[in-house]
């Protein structure tokens, strides 16, 4: 993961406090797990070697989100409509899962958002892919095939999670988000295209959750080397 770009809800907001409460709650259920800040990882493996690089990345984040939002507004404005991509929150949720991977032990899965995906593609092209001849195509392929935005609620090596713990996880998420969790069946013939092989349990929400955040929010460049407790925020910018 090395150097990653996060998008975080504003501190003190309903989204921040609700997600942080769930993270603390699951840490008590799995005591050896670390506590961390709620965030969506926009991209990781950033080429970032200095404070100047950090500042360039953050400046590019602001420029990218402003440009993409303006483009979406103008595109729909010509038709006399308000763009759904502009009106919809950058981060909202449609389900959750308990996975096999350490960093995806319990996650809230995000709805697709054109602006968030656009920012991820731009940042990937500018600061991850280094070959000038292939960076655009590789970033486009990555965002369409590998970018699955989510908010992690638990980091843990425990697998499988017991049925008793699964019931607690389900109940706490239902209570916090005011939704009912409906088990999602794996689509036949999907292979692992939907990530089914990487999860122990996956649920959809029965209704749309109001938990979300848009702008304002905070981009952070984070050094994710070593144990979670040693991760360091190298820079941040509010949008």
UniProtKB/Swiss-Prot annotation:
Which Enzyme Commission number(s) are listed?
Answer: 3.1.4.37
Q: Which GO terms describe its biological process?
A: cyclic nucleotide metabolic process
Q: What is one Pfam family matched by this protein?
A: CPDase
**Main location as per UniProt:** Golgi
Q: Name one GO cellular component term.
A: clathrin-coated vesicle
Q: Which residues form a coiled coil?
A: none
GO terms (molecular function) for this protein are: 2',3'-cyclic-nucleotide 3'-phosphodiesterase activity
Keywords, sorted A to Z: Golgi apparatus, Hydrolase
Active site (catalytic residues): 39 (proton donor/acceptor), 150 (proton donor/acceptor)
Which subcellular locations apply to this protein? Golgi apparatus
* Phenotype for residue 39 to A: Abolishes cyclic nucleotide phosphodiesterase activity
Keyword Hydrolase listed: yes
Catalysed reaction(s)?
ADP-alpha-D-ribose 1'',2''-cyclic phosphate + H2O = ADP-alpha-D-ribose 1''-phosphate + H(+); 2',3'-cyclophospho-AMP + H2O = adenosine 2'-phosphate + H(+); 2',3'-cyclophospho-GMP + H2O = guanosine 2'-phosphate + H(+); 2',3'-cyclophospho-UMP + H2O = uridine 2'-phosphate + H(+)
- Cite the InterPro entries for this sequence: Cyclic-nucl_3Pdiesterase, Cyclic_Pdiesterase
Q: Which family does it belong to?
A: Belongs to the 2H phosphoesterase superfamily. CPD1 family.
Describe the task this protein carries out: Involved in the metabolism of ADP-ribose 1',2'-cyclic phosphate which is produced as a consequence of tRNA splicing.
Q: Which PANTHER family match?
A: 2',3'-CYCLIC-NUCLEOTIDE 3'-PHOSPHODIESTERASE
**What else does the entry mention about this protein?**
Present with 1520 molecules/cell in log phase SD medium.
The protein's name in its UniProt record: 2',3'-cyclic-nucleotide 3'-phosphodiesterase
Which organism encodes this protein?
Saccharomyces cerevisiae (strain ATCC 204508 / S288c) (Baker's yeast)
